[in-house]
Design a protein with these regions (language model features):
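Extended, positively charged loop/linker patches that create polyanion-binding surfaces
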Residues: 138
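Active-site pocket-lining/capping segments in soluble small-molecule metabolic enzymes
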Residues: 2-132, 150-154, 158-242, 249-392, ...
Length: 802
């Protein structure tokens, strides 16, 4: 019985323009400049935890304001959830269903599982953090009850159009804003450096920093900003129904400028579109973004998406500090500068910048309100001894900024009419009584009222008269969706009596609906709370089982080692002949082999992967590790389906017991827990009986970034080095780029502790070094002794995953 909007969503004929609303001010900027919908976050579970975000009370009034204007609001719950946070998540879902939000945007399978089972009033959108990049992934979402997929930004227009033909699901795609170097949801860079996880909404953006490769400084991992304003007809033709603007961390001024520009182009008639695009591009130049790129939309190998010589900072570059005083800076400004503009100074060390608003401005020895481009200016700073000569100065907003205080925003929101609840009404007049039956959701009310009626000489009581009377809810926020009136006699009822009946009936109905909605909220909440798994009693430790991940089939004889229970080997779709040859060697060890499916599987290679899976199943292999939602369909129609042993890899995110249970619901028998996790959460998860086996990766090379972006001129034989002397290896293979630390991840040395928590299945990933290399042998020896290998990191295990 939620109060969701009935306004039309995006379609291929008229797309939805979807704007960020990281603050109340940005919400109004979006509304006033033509957004059809906005997405916003709450204080918890938002992938932009550093944004202002909104409260539940704010959201309630925002929904009133938006729905009154036929607009929609989607709420982001697109982070990974810790075990201890599940009770808060359940309460959040109950409140969002009660409020009637138009959809929630989801990453963690726990949110899907709980919403599907206990909060049916919530529409689900799959976040781009789920890395949906092929038709099989979209079709899987459709089967799971999602209504929309936010596609990976790595897809081309051609790939989107081909995908569109294979699904009826709503498709959403980013058209403007910051790009991640990595596939969204698959970056561990920030978390690796300090526990601030991008998948928990706290990315510290180390990709935007400057690095060194063979003494050449550059911004190797910093993409330019997406701008697809001249590709909107192509996106619509490809089947994208929602055009999304990135920027919940951006100012209201940015939102106003970008939404206004895209609205102008979307609404332009075909004959005027060229002029509209030209004007919109000019307006976008003032939005203080990075250099524009079309991203992958025009092809899989864009040359302008990441240029190492271009700074990764946002804002319009004004110049470098030529002189730094104790509390002022001097520089030659490239663009006009005004009192009221906001500046950010970026240190040459490439650490975080410092922002401040220009309060006074000096040109020469005179104070000025503004200075034209090309002028040497002196700007007093509120910070003492903070800046140095050579630091870069950026303008990040102008004096003309869209400004509205939070208090002013809330006053405007409270002026919106409460959202009416739709009702259907049946009316009958019989034996001097007006019989009414109303229904709204699960609530039904029937009442009879004595009325005075007179024979009608003209204009007898009819459906239109009744609609006119009962369409007005008065003080009760109800909306007449439909009215049925059967066999009305030719009489007249005094209008005053009809209005009094409406007032009495609607007053009772409104109270009944309110009580029913609250009872439904409590019932759904209690059901979901009861479904959360309790802690289980501690069980006796089982014998540890070791699985070793290999990089190729040449190390298959590792299975001769009695301490190795299983091996994981890569399934490479285009090398089916090699797979078949390797499979022949393994006929007697089939149950000890797990075939690892490639995480990224574009539609051009998906069928090859399916053929390889079927060939392996026919050869008697049953164990496969899945790493993306698009992998589940690979096993549809496979013979011996019931004999399959499917493992969920860590890229499917199992950070809590509900996510692990979700994979069980989909036929998975074992889940590999999330390597970003910390000690406390791992222990809490392992204390729950999810009904699936759990494995923990205890050693490996973590791919901090997986990307479709090719870095020209950078090879794997030399590291890319940070200003802190941290070294990273860049590898390119199969059209993908991976960036890994030279330092391995390892929990070896903590095995006894993990076993005490209840873990008994461990994965040692030696794909990057080889099982029989000196380093591989050292790691296996360290595992046998539970001794920490040299030069490794425990990632977040001993510190908190934030």
């Amino acid at each position: 019985m939620s109060r969701s909007s009935t306004s039309r969503r995006g379609s291929e004929s008229r797309p939805e323009l979807l704007s960020p609303a990281g603050s109340l001010e940005a919400f109004f900027a979006a509304m006033e400049n033509g957004a059809d919908a906005v997405y916003c976050g709450l204080p918890e579970f938002s992938a932009r935890a550093k944004a202002k975000n909104v409260t539940f009370d704010d959201l309630d009034h925002m929904l009133d304001y938006a729905h009154e204007r036929g607009r929609r609001i989607y709420v982001t719950l697109n982070t990974l959830i810790k075990e201890a946070e599940l009770p808060t998540l359940v309460r959040t879902l109950a409140d969002l269903e009660h409020l009637g939000v138009d959809a929630v945007i989801v990453q963690d399978a726990a949110v899907w599982r709980l919403a599907r089972a206990h909060f049916p009033g919530l529409r689900l959108h799959a976040s781009t953090q789920m890395t949906i990049h092929n038709a099989a992934g979209v079709r899987t979402l459709e089967k799971l009850g999602f209504s929309r997929a936010v596609l990976a930004r790595e897809l081309t227009l051609e790939e989107i159009a081909a995908l569109r033909k294979q699904t009826r699901l709503e498709l959403e795609h980013f058209v403007h804003g910051a790009l991640c170097f990595s596939f969204s949801g698959q970056c561990y860079f920030s978390s690796w450096l300090g526990g601030q996880s991008g998948n928990r909404g706290r990315c510290a953006q180390p990709c935007r920093r400057r690095y060194r490769y063979q003494q050449q400084q550059g911004y190797y991992f910093s993409p330019n900003d997406l701008c697809a304003i001249d590709l909107l007809p192509d996106l619509i033709a490809a089947g994208v129904g929602s055009l999304k603007i990135e920027g919940r961390m951006k100012s209201a001024e940015y939102v106003a400028a970008v939404v206004g520009a895209y609205r102008q182009v979307i609404d332009a008639a075909p004959a005027q579109r060229k002029d509209a695009v030209r004007e919109a591009k000019q307006a976008l130049k003032l939005s203080f973004g990075r250099l524009p790129t079309r991203g992958f939309l025009t092809g899989p190998r864009p040359t302008d998406i990441a240029v190492p010589s271009v700074k990764g900072a946002t804002g319009r570059f004004l110049g470098e500090i030529s002189a730094a005083g104790r509390s002022s800076i001097s520089f030659k400004t490239r663009d006009a500068l005004h009192v009221g503009d906001r500046l950010r100074v970026q240190p040459r060390s490439d650490q975080a910048g410092t922002a401040f608003t220009v309060k006074t401005l000096n040109v020469g020895r005179r104070s000025a309100k503004q200075a034209p481009g090309g002028t040497l200016v002196n700007v007093p700073s509120p910070f003492e001894n903070r800046f140095k000569k050579g630091d870069a100065v950026f303008k990040v907003s102008s004096r003309k900024a869209f400004t509205l205080s939070d208090a002013a925003c809330r006053r405007r929101l409270k002026g919106a009419a409460p959202r009416p609840l739709p009702i259907s009404l049946s009316v009958r007049l019989q034996n001097g009584q007006l019989q009414l039956k109303a229904q709204s959701g699960e609530v039904t009310l029937e009442r009879s009222f004595d009325v005075s009626s007179f024979a009608a000489h003209k204009n007898p009581l009819n459906t239109e008269t009744l609609k006119e009377v009962f369409a007005r809810g008065g003080d009760t926020p109800l909306e007449l969706a439909e009215l049925h009136a059967a066999d009305l006699p030719p009489v007249v009822i005094p209008p005053r009596e009809l209005k009094e009946i409406r007032r009495t009936f609607y007053g009772e109905l409104g109270g009944l609906i309110a009580r029913g909605r609250e009872q439904q909220r409590r019932a759904h909440l209690e059901q979901a709370q009861a479904a959360l798994l309790p802690e289980k009693q501690a069980a006796a430790a089982k014998d540890a089982r070791l699985t070793v991940a290999l990089g190729s089939l040449r190390d298959l004889h590792l299975l001769n080692d009695p301490t190795v229970d299983r091996i994981i080997v890569p399934l490479v779709p285009h090398r089916a002949a090699d797979i078949a040859a390797g499979a022949a060697k393994l006929r007697n060890r089939r149950e000890q082999v797990i075939w690892d499916l490639p995480f990224i599987l574009f539609d051009t290679t998906w069928q090859q992967a399916r053929d390889a899976v079927r060939a392996l199943v026919s050869a008697g292999f049953h164990s496969f590790r899945l790493n993306n939602l698009g992998h589940f369909e690979l096993f549809d129609g496979v013979r011996e389906r019931e004999a399959l042993k499917l493992t969920a890899g860590y890229r499917l995110f199992s950070l809590n017991s509900q996510a692990a249970s979700a994979w069980k619901d989909l036929g998975v028998g074992e889940v590999t827990l999330y390597p970003e996790d910390d000690r406390e959460n791992l222990a809490a998860l392992l204390r729950r009986d999810t009904g699936v086996e759990t494995a923990i990766t205890v050693h490996g090379q973590i791919p901090l970034i997986t990307s479709r972006i090719h870095i020209r001129g950078v090879r794997s034989d030399r590291p890319v080095v940070s200003d802190r002397d941290e070294k990273y290896i860049v590898q390119s293979r199969g059209g993908l780029t991976t960036i890994s630390s030279e330092t391995d991840f390892s929990l070896i040395g903590h095995l006894a502790e993990l076993r005490a928590m209840g873990a008994d299945r461990f994965v040692v990933d030696l794909a990057h070094v080889g099982a029989f290399s000196p380093r591989g042998k050292q790691i296996l020896a360290a595992y046998a002794e539970d001794r920490p290998p040299a030069q490794t990191s425990s990632f977040n295990f001993e510190r908190e995953l934030v």
